[in-house]
Curated annotation (Swiss-Prot):
Pfam families: Actin. The keyword Cytoplasm applies. GO terms for cellular component: actin cytoskeleton; cytoplasm. The gene is SAC1. This is Actin-1. There are at least 16 actin genes in soybean. PROSITE patterns: ACTINS_1 (PS00406), ACTINS_2 (PS00432), ACTINS_ACT_LIKE (PS01132). Its EC number is 3.6.4.-. The keyword Transmembrane helix does not apply. InterPro entries: Actin, Actin/actin-like_CS, Actin_CS, ATPase_NBD. GO terms for molecular function: ATP binding; hydrolase activity. It comes from Glycine max. It catalyses: ATP + H2O = ADP + phosphate + H(+). Gene3D superfamilies: 3.30.420.40, Actin, Chain A, domain 4 (3.90.640.10).
């Protein structure tokens, strides 16, 4: 094996909705594909097609008509390990075209990831893929590093789950982490429901993809919902049209801000939960009184569901209303926040000081899977 210094570590951020993977030192992930595994509904539908027993990512998406699609990651946590192995195999061999036994691998995990899951990740990497070294890092810590900070509170909202994670000098504070099972997929579902009530039919997974695209292109956060509603009723400035693949044009107005508004008011989708602003505030209040000032001044947004226009302004407004009046509040929405976790991983894995964080194969063989709790962070 070549000298460890010459070999770029692999960075793999496994999200509920998308896998982001690439080589450490790059400024963006080389591979971004849906975290799905599809299996044929009927065996050998077409004779002589040389059908595979499973399809992963975009390939599964394209052939979804004949497949049953499964998401191996639910709410940020791996729930189906066989399918997860298929996703990793696809990531290394088909997307990145690298040999995992030649590169250290940095994996991300959800905050509050069960201990068993963390051990299992390392076991699969060492025993199935033969990785020379592995590190498992909490995704929110990586987002914070990507924004150039070591202390702050990260609101990470992806496709399947949102978390607020207070971090002090590089360490997440587990007692104050809060999880909210409300994220991008719920917003897409809500928009599908509104459109269905308006007489459009969006039911299949293919149509769900169209609605997700509509959400990503047209939705925005209203600074003041009441005000925005009045505007949308009296003028057409809020209305935008969207062309469906079949040429039909849909016009959406109030739905543009109503859909992501659910993040601040989960009761709109029947959830008895606090909105993202209140969850962030509650998370800060669980921390020691001496560090709250540092957290209020460094609220960092990360993940695809924080990409809505005006989200930082609204967040700032809502938290100012909850916090002590003299408190200085700063909400940071880095432009690259969609891939913030991956970028943080890329930065971290390229640092020479990071060498002591890796678990080498020899250490794993000696101590077994529980070593992941001693090293990594």
């Amino acid at each position: 094996m070549a000298d460890a210094e010459d070999i770029q570590p692999l960075v793999c951020d496994n999200g509920t909705g998308m896998v982001k993977a690439g080589l450490a030192g790059d400024d963006a992930p080389r591979a971004v594909f849906p975290s799905i595994v599809g299996r044929p509904r009927h065996t050998x539908v077409v004779v002589g097609m040389g059908q595979k027993d499973a399809y992963v990512g975009d390939e599964a998406q394209v052939q979804r008509g004949i497949l049953t699609l499964k998401y191996p990651i639910e709410h940020g946590i791996v729930s189906n390990w066989d399918d997860m192995e298929k996703i990793w195999h696809h990531t290394f061999y088909n997307e990145l075209r690298v040999a995992p036994e030649e590169h250290p691998v940095l994996l991300t995990e959800a905050p509050l990831n069960p201990k068993y899951n963390r051990e299992k990740m390392x076991r699969v990497m060492f025993e199935t893929f033969g990785a020379p070294a592995v590190c498992v890092a909490v995704l929110a810590v990586l987002s914070l590093y990507a924004s150039g900070r070591t202390t702050g509170i990260v609101l990470d909202s992806g496709d399947g789950v949102s978390h607020t994670v207070p971090i002090y000098e590089g360490y997440a504070l587990p007692h104050a982490i809060l999880r909210l099972d409300l994220a991008g997929r719920d917003l897409t579902d809500f928009l599908m429901k509104i459109l269905t009530q308006r007489g459009y039919s969006f039911t299949t997974s293919a149509q769900r993809g169209i609605v997700r695209d509509m959400k990503e292109k047209l939705a925005y956060i209203a600074l003041d919902c009441e005000q925005e509603l009045e505007t949308s009723e009296t003028s057409s400035s809020v209305e935008k049209s969207y062309e469906l693949p079949d040429g039909q044009v849909i016009t959406i107005g109030a739905e543009r801000f109503g859909c992501p508004g659910v993040l601040y008011q989960p009761s709109m989708v029947g959830m008895e939960a606090s909105g993202i602003h209140e969850t962030t505030y509650n998370s800060i209040m669980k921390c020691d009184v001496d560090i709250r000032k540092d957290l209020y001044g460094n609220i960092v947004l990360s993940g695809g569901t924080t990409m809505f226009p005006s989200i930082a302004d609204r967040m700032s407004k809502e938290i100012s209303a909850l916090a002590p009046s003299s408190m200085k509040i700063k909400v940071v929405a880095p432009s690259e926040r969609k891939f913030g976790v991956w970028i943080g991983g890329s930065i971290l894995a390229s640092l020479s000081t990071f060498q002591q964080m890796w678990i080498x194969k020899a250490e794993y063989d000696e101590s077994g899977p529980s070593i992941v709790h001693k090293k990594c962070f």
